[in-house]
Each structure stands twice: as structure tokens, then as C-alpha cells.
Amino acid sequence: MKWRLLRTGHKSGAWNMAVDEAIMVHVAKKAVPPTFRLYGWAPPALSLGRLQSFERDINPDGCRRLGVDVVRRPTGGRAVLHDNEVTYSFIISEDDPMLPSDLRDSFYLATEGIVKGLAFLGIEAEIRGRQGGGGSLADAYRSELRTRPGADGSVQSGACFDSPSWYEVVAADKKLVGSAQARLSGVFLQHGSILITMDTDKMCQVLKFEDPADRDRAQAQLLDKATSIEAILRRAVSFREVEEAVIAGVREHIKPIELVEGELLPEELSCAEDLMSQKYAADSWTKRR
């Protein structure tokens, strides 16, 4: 059995999301095998969860000032600032015998290879379960919470990396990889961010807060709850180094399945172009909530 590996480089947020959905369309048609893709973002982009409120959570003036695009994902969860990171996506048919029916078990299938890849970099990471978490896709979509002071004085922001999920990839007791899932037309998608560096100030400038004090508290929470590869290793790390390590980890995890490097089909590229222009680059999608 063979799965496809794609390395598609640094592209715009609208293009990246369009490609993920285009691959889903063609996996549904059985035109392509299960696909593991690695990519980056140029320019940096803020991605919203599918059901997240643009008006409530996003600061468009801050995004424009910092040169940050805004795009809405097909997956749930909260906002992620995609800048210096390696992003992965894993796409497989729901009827594939390799895909568990349980949502949390499917997270493990898609993520354990990344944990192994981090080990090749010298990072001891683990998948840590959240107690009491539900297993339905609706539960994932309920994670978009209004920015407000919590009972303990904390701030619940629109940021992914200050919020819990059922299973998190953590290192040094902090969240290192943020992921989200979707199921569409019989196809499973999981994509996520592997942070090389983390700019909490920039993240908090592109999100909306009621006052500066809330922004300061949210930034402190991000520093407390999230980390990055360079923060752990205390050295400069390149996109390519992380990419190669993750590929090695995924290959080890899925043995005896072979991960074969390939390219997007012309039909996938055409589909992605249509999805980008009609959906992911359109305000009707990005600002629909």
C-alpha cells in the first residue's frame, strides 16, 4: 500500500486551504491515494475556525498593519497565526481500513508520526489526552469561545494555542502542535501547525480584545501554555530541517505503508484555483460569521 507525500512550499492562506479541500475532493473520487502534505505560508496568515466569528475575534486593522492575510479554514477550532511554522495536512477516505472510526483515535493516527518526527529533532513530545473530552465533530466546533475574563481572571481569546483539545501534542508541558479536523463527503481531513517560532505579541495584535489589559493577559497565557521548536532547542531551525524530520517520523509510523513523494494532479490544481477564487479568497466565506 502506498500513500502520497506532497511538499508544496510557501503559498497564500487562501491557496493553502483551497489545496487541502481540492485534495479531499479527489480522495473522495478515489482519484488519488491518502495524502500527507507539508506546506508554509507566504505572506503570514491568520486562519479562523470554520464556525468562528470574524467580527467578534479578529482585528482587521492589526492584520493589515502587520501584513497578515485572513482566511477561514474548513475545519473547526480557533484562530491560528501561521508564520514561521511547518503546516501539515493528512487526508484519507473514511472507508479506508487504516482510519479508525473514533475521532480521537483518528487524531492519533494523523499525529503520532509528527511526534516521532519531533524526536528526530531532539524534542521529547507526547500526545496528552484531555480528561472529559467528547468525541464528536460537534464538540470540536464548540471550541470557539467569546473573548472574556474567565472565573480565574484569565482571558479566553480567539487563539488556538491558548485553548485545550481532546488530545494535544505537548513538549516541556506546553502545546507545540495545534490541529483541527473535518469530515466532508466521506473524507477525513486533519491539518495543523508545528511552530518553529512563536510571536505572541503579533498573535495578540491580530486578534480583537475589549481592552489592552485583556490583550496583555492573553499574551501572558500564550507564553505560559504554548511553545515552539526553537524555544525548546535553543537554536535556529529551518523549515527544511523540520520538514525532513516530520517526513521521517511519518514514514516510520505508517510502516509497512510506503510514503511516496508526488505532485498535485492537474485536476487538483484546477479545482484548487476554483475553490480559491470562489471560496477561500472571498469575503463571503471569510467574513460569513
Regions found by a protein language model. Give the residues of each.
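Active-site loop/lid in soluble adenylation, ligation, and acyl-transfer enzymes
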Residues: 1-57, 61-65, 69-73, 142, ...
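Short connector loops at helix/strand junctions that flank enzyme active sites
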Residues: 41-43, 65, 81-85, 164, ...
